[in-house]
Amino acid sequence: MCPVTTFLVLVLTLLVLVYVFLTWNFNYWRKRGIKTAPTWPFVGSFPSIFTRKRNIAYDIDDIYEKYKDTDNMVGVFTTRVPQLLVMCPEYIHKIYATDFRSFHNNEWRNFVNKKTDMILGNNPFVLTGDEWKERRSEIMPALSPNRVKAVYPVSQSVCKKFVEYIRRQQQMATSEGLDAMDLSLCYTTEVVSDCGLGVSAQSFTDTPTPLLKMIKRVFNTSFEFIFYSVVTNLWQKVRKFYSVPFFNKETEVFFLDIIRRCITLRLEKPEQQRDDFLNYMLQLQEKKGLHTDNILINTMTFILDGFETTALVLAHIMLMLGRNPEEQDKVRKEIGSADLTFDQMSELPHLDACIYETLRLFSPQVAARKLVTEPFEFANKNGRTVHLKPGDVVTIPVKALHHDPQYYEDPLTFKPERFLESNGGGMKSYRDRGVYLAFGDGPRHCPGMRFALTQLKAALVEILRNFEIKVNPKTRSDNQIDDTFFMATLKGGIYLDFKDL
């Protein structure tokens, strides 16, 4: 055999072996009697992972629309990892709540190594079993209604500064308006650092501290982590000897240093104690011997969980109120002109409804993935039962459920009234039916939900009292979400104009 022929045979053999490696388990769900969505080598069921031409959420939407009327679930693959896309709201509520023990863990734990990623690896979202229970039990009391109420005056003070910052920025703005995400990040950075650590990030000045700059960088996922995620989906055993942190070392060192300095200051100057998150952690250390590392980790969890998602939601609420001036006027009338107490802030049903409706249209988490932790069974519409075993992955199509006309009339339209309790039970009724998952559900629901909602409402109250929000023409008019960002945000950015009232 000539050298050229030998080379071609070797190449062909290699290609065949690679193809077999990538596709050998594509019958994983068919063998169990479950339909499988169209699947391709390398990309699995979600080609947008590689093409980057649209957000992966739209791949999930297409599969959901194709199978939702005939099946309760359908098999899908992320590269070559089998997952069960569950479309039945009753089953979804079981996964989150009633049968939680069988779906206890989030799939993210498969990609995070605690040894190499101290920040995310110790986050309750990633932790499992007793570690998750212990960490959550440390954090939840610090976010109780009484403690959120205790820092509410701090939030009000930050909001008034925020209004003045918006006013100054608007005076200097070009015809393209103000970047709503930049504004929102300035606000959440300031309010989280003040309520959590008792320090100002100087976000509303011309010389902000490095904290604001670092926070704007922190969720820019590195190419190395994306590559690692793809490789581990192709060959899961690689996790045993190769791991890449979601947050880089510079980020970790920066935040740990800030928190250590804040702890030292509190211990050296007890007269500066405040009833905030860090103070609660120090009290827990004194009462129960909480290790200093746990204080650092818990405080980092509070900070990092508190700014990016809340900023995204605030930016999109302002967008939706700008697009719907009649709803903006309703909220403005509801809040009135007098300062609101914490309890009064909790009783603004139309503002709540606007927040919930925005989260329905732009839920930051477009899909959720859970690991099966105990054997479980689901019945399909054809009567066939699928037996799930520990380690299997179930995917919940959050965005698709939120946009399904079967559950939400005219789903692409901003209709806050659907979440008013006077119209059928409010947000909780949708959540209990398994079709509203903006905050998750069950024991692993978002621990910072109460704090985040308070900060959102406090900001919106002050903004709407002082400004009329208008959407700048630079902002697109549809709800197309960004192609690559892993949380749902409007493609092209949100640009707003603020007119003094």
Swiss-Prot record:
* Similarity section: Belongs to the cytochrome P450 family.
Annotated organism of origin: Drosophila melanogaster
- Which Gene Ontology terms of cellular component type are present? endoplasmic reticulum membrane
Protein name, as recorded: Probable cytochrome P450 28d2
- Per the record, the gene is Cyp28d2
State which Enzyme Commission number(s) the record gives. 1.14.-.-
Q: Which Pfam families match?
A: p450
The molecular function GO annotations come to: heme binding; iron ion binding; monooxygenase activity; oxidoreductase activity, acting on paired donors, with incorporation or reduction of molecular oxygen
Which superkingdom does the taxonomy of this entry point to? Answer: Eukaryota
